[in-house]
């Protein structure tokens, strides 16, 4: 029996609550300005983006609330701040679109996932609008119905 090819997943961390709490409109790929010890810690998977948020100041985008736990061996010569504010690397047009979405349309910017692209750490961010309780219930019902439908179709073809 042949083995399945090992599909390497480049995802480092996902913000699962973002898709539950927000309706995502658009998504963008942003680079992160990181220090050396942060890259080493990210390679070991010591990152959490669940409580993170993106804000715009002076025409630049920043992310706050990302927790990168420093490694004991890698960060001995620097004072490591695990929750420091990090700059996002975006094009001017992308920053202008984000600024328009936040100011005019009342949307917010949330971090969706962090992943490797070649040797670079990238962050997938999205403009989003908060969901109401009835929207969350409707999404839950539609997911349950889709799951039941698949189960029914699977058993009906036998």
UniProtKB/Swiss-Prot annotation:
Localization of this protein: Cytoplasm
Organism of derivation: Photobacterium profundum (strain SS9)
A Pfam family recorded for this sequence: SmpB
Gene name in the database record: smpB
GO biological process assignments: trans-translation
Protein name (record): SsrA-binding protein
Compositionally biased spans, kind Basic and acidic residues: 136-151
Start and end residues of each stretch annotated as Disordered: 136-158
Family the entry assigns: Belongs to the SmpB family.
HAMAP family from the UniProt entry: SmpB
GO annotations of cellular component type: cytosol
Main location: cytoplasm
GO molecular function annotation: RNA binding
